Amino acid sequence: MMPYRLLIDRAMKSQPIEIWGNCKKAKEMVYIKDFVRLVRNCVDSELEGGCYNVGNGWQVTLEEQIKGIIEVFSPKDKPSEVVYCPEKPDPLQNAFAVEKTFRELNWKPIYSYLDQLRDFKHEMETEPMAGLWGTKEDYKE
């Protein structure tokens, strides 16, 4: 099962969710909707080519990721508890220099991390891609 789906499943069941390592480690979370907009800008661009980093210019900490999952997926009357485990291995961290992408391709992301999670929840509920990703039942523990 995909790690995110495990975390989401725990949140939906109001089960505790562990944060391993340094909860302030952060990474960029580029949403596919923003990425598609960037590809469209590349196709429409009059530039002859180039190398561009894809990023959103802001990072989401591990703590923000977990709290976002809880906010969107946990029952409002019984949200999952966050359990901090600083002794466990740290997650990877990343950030990209994206100023050139923003400037030359006239692009900036418009979707937040919570937008991504809300859309993901909607797709889980409506299952438009069940044939490709499976159904809710495929992700039960």
Question: Across the structure, where does each feature detected by a protein language model lie?
Answer:
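Flexible, glycine-rich beta-alpha linker
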Residues: 1-3
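C-terminal substrate-binding subdomain of Rossmann-fold SDR/epimerase-dehydratase oxidoreductases
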Residues: 11-141
